[in-house]
């Protein structure tokens, strides 16, 4: 079968790779001049398979009020827009801020995340996929507030494989935290989690795909229209050319919303803007070897070979991916206070990207309402973590096979 995939970030590339592995011909379409130049370019790097709790949770609305008073220092910032889409998304987000809803969605995400880890392992072992700074280094979520620690501990279940640590044990796991020991209340450790460079992963997938005669890449081309006949998409229009297809996968991140609106498909996806720094290492002893998430400041740290990736923040503020220097300054200050001397944060490479998120925090994988149009969108901050599993499940369904794990709670409602 001939399958077109729109979007060449980590979700689209993983989908294309899985489809080609399963014997399909793939046309991968990307509006930028190269792959993985947007949300997949400089994200947090953590493959957080066991710590997958959605942003929407009990207590977040009240916290958000306090955060809004902090301005550029706030982990989450809301800037109202004259947009019905934004306000509707925010209302759905508030409705999802219940503990029961959070736990249910976290279970769906954990199921998908653990499958995604298995698929990446199989690709690495069976295909010798490497060259993207992958390590199995574990993840440590540190807490500076006792109430937050108790809340996090209550969410640990047997399947997650997580362990509750006191402050001294946190330092044992990650000695680079020694200067912070007095301010820590404890942590949650996930020894099975991993790290990798998402952009390098994408370029390696592309290199493998280009070796296949079943793969064709279209870059620098925007989709002009989708030609439909009844409940089927017959072709993707690129400029003056029609690309005839048997199936279409939309994996265009936040761009999926506008792309599908003319077909009457209203995706509940909104961009959550995040920021990152990529820092050249200066002092190896001050750089964390383990993935570290500072829960109270909402900052993640991941070592990628000879660099430290620092990522943070959620701006619910529209579709502009430009850098906000006040937010960058906050990130530099927090990183300097947490891992001083690890590198020169003032000279770090700065980046901002738009995470395509649903209000509930769960992605939309599978059917769209059209017979041959499929979705793989809405992964939020977990796109890299969930990419391989999402790709495997969707390519199985497209090929007529049952998915390896249930897509319950991970699809567009009928």
Briefly describe each language-model feature range:
Residues 2-28:
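N-terminal Rossmann-like FAD-binding beta1-loop-alpha1 element of flavoenzymes
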Residues 153-154, 180-242:
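Helical element adjacent to the flavin cofactor pocket in flavoenzyme catalytic cores
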Residues 43-46, 51, 55-95, 225-228, ...:
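Active-site substrate-recognition segment that forms the wall
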Residues 192, 295-296, 336-414:
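C-terminal catalytic lobe of FAD-dependent flavoproteins
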Residues 21-41:
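Glycine-rich FAD pyrophosphate-binding loop
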Residues 87-204:
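Rossmann-like flavin
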């Amino acid at each position: 079968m001939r399958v077109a995939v729109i979007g060449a970030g980590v979700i689209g590339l993983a989908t294309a790779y899985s489809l080609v592995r399963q014997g399909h011909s793939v046309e991968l379409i990307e509006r930028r001049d190269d792959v993985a130049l947007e949300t997949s370019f400089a994200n947090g790097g953590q493959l957080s398979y066991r710590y997958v709790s959605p942003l929407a949770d009990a207590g977040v609305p009240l916290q958000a009020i306090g955060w809004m008073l902090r301005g550029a220092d706030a982990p989450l910032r809301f800037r109202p827009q004259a947009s019905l889409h934004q306000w509707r998304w925010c209302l759905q987000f508030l409705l999802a801020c219940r503990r029961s809803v959070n736990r249910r969605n976290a279970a769906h995400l954990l199921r998908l995340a653990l499958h995604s880890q298995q698929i990446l392992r199989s690709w690495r072992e069976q295909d010798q996929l490497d060259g993207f700074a992958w390590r199995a280094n574990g993840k440590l979520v540190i807490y500076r507030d006792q109430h937050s620690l108790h809340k996090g501990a209550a969410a640990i279940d047997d399947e997650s494989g997580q362990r509750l640590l006191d402050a001294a044990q946190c330092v044992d796991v990650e000695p680079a935290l020694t200067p912070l020991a007095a301010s820590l209340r404890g942590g949650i450790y996930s020894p099975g989690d991993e790290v990798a460079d998402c952009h390098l992963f994408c370029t390696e997938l592309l290199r493998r795909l280009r070796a296949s005669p079943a793969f064709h890449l279209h870059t620098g081309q925007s989709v002009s229209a989708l030609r439909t006949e009844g409940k089927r998409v017959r072709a993707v229009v690129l400029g003056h050319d029609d690309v005839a297809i048997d199936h279409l996968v939309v994996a265009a991140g936040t761009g999926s919303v506008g792309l599908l609106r003319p077909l009457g498909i209203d995706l509940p996806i909104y961009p959550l803007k995040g920021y990152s720094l990529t820092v050249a290492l200066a002092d190896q002893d001050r750089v964390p070897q383990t993935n570290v998430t500072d829960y109270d400041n909402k900052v993640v740290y991941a070592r990628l070979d000879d660099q430290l990736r620092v990522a943070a923040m959620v701006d619910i503020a529209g579709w502009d991916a430009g850098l906000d220097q006040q937010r960058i300054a906050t990130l530099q200050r927090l990183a300097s206070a947490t891992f001083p001397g690890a590198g020169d944060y003032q000279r770090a490479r700065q980046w901002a990207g738009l995470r395509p998120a649903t209000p509930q925090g769960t992605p939309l994988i599978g059917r769209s309402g059209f017979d041959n149009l499929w979705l793989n969108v809405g992964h939020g901050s977990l796109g890299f973590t969930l990419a391989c599993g999402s790709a495997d499940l969707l390519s199985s369904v497209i090929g007529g096979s049952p998915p390896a794990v249930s897509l319950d709670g991970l699809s567009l409602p009928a």
